């Protein structure tokens, strides 16, 4: 529940592992055709890199589905509080939610790398797994960590604010939750798009 330390329970970790494995295998299938003449490890490396780039969106969605109802409910109880009280509550929740989001990233990437080695029988050794880990771009990893933390904080603010707004306008809990989820997804996707277009050198045309 909101207000209690969020633990990495088995269900949340399990969903993260499943998401990482599924994403990696999906990207490998997409890349295997166009890059069929490239060495297998190149395909796996690209798949893991792509998974790392998409990981913040997936982790944010998992946390939103898990914590959204409780956070919207918490927001409804802040309707008569001053804006400063809402900010204090956001800070308190951010201390537990943002580290949780960041902590899920290694699980997702580990599952992606393991599934990548299992897609090809010849890539099932520990050496190949270490190779995939070693070829994960530090820049992509840092960006994934930053975006995961940023998206988690943004979703936290949206859910609390929507709960507060719903209580003020006398909206139902389901309507508030639906709006919070829709707005959170739209904001995160939009921010990710702006990030890629403006800050990614490979897209914006800037130097590396």
Residue ranges and their predicted role:
Residues 62, 66-67, 141-153:
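Selective recognition of hydrophobic, aromatic-rich stretches within alpha-helical transmembrane segments
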Residues 11-33, 184-198:
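Hydrophobic alpha-helical transmembrane segments of multi-pass membrane transport/permease proteins
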Residues 4-8, 33-68:
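Membrane-embedded or membrane-proximal helical elements that form or frame transporter/channel pores
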Residues 1-12, 170:
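Cytosolic juxtamembrane amphipathic/interface segments immediately preceding
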Residues 71-91, 173:
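Short cytoplasmic-facing helical segments at TM-TM junctions of multi-pass membrane proteins
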Residues 13, 17, 67, 86-110, ...:
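Selective transmembrane-helix segments that form parts of the transport pathway or gating/packing helices
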Residues 30-52, 110-149, 158-179, 202-208:
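Membrane-interfacial helix-loop-helix connectors in multipass membrane proteins
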Residues 22-23, 112-113, 151-156, 160, ...:
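Hydrophobic core segments of alpha-helical transmembrane domains in multi-pass membrane transport
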């Amino acid at each position: 529940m909101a207000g209690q330390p969020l633990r990495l329970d088995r269900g949340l970790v399990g969903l993260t592992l499943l998401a990482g494995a599924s994403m990696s295998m999906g990207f490998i299938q997409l890349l295997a055709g166009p890059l069929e003449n490239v060495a297998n490890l190149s395909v796996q490396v690209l798949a893991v890199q792509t998974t790392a780039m998409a990981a913040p969106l997936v982790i944010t969605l998992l946390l939103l589905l898990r914590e959204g109802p409780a956070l919207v409910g918490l927001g409804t109880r802040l309707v008569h509080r001053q804006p400063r009280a809402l900010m204090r509550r956001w800070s308190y929740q951010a201390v537990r939610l943002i580290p949780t989001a960041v902590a899920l990233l290694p699980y997702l990437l580990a599952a992606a790398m393991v599934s990548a080695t299992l897609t090809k029988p010849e890539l099932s050794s520990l050496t190949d797994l270490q190779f995939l880990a070693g070829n994960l771009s530090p820049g992509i990893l840092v960006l994934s960590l930053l975006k995961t933390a940023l998206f988690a904080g943004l979703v936290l603010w949206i859910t609390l604010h929507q709960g507060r707004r719903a209580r003020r306008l006398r909206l139902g809990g389901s309507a508030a939750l639906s709006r919070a989820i829709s707005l959170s997804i739209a904001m995160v996707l939009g921010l990710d798009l702006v990030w890629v277009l403006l800050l990614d050198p490979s897209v914006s045309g800037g130097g590396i």
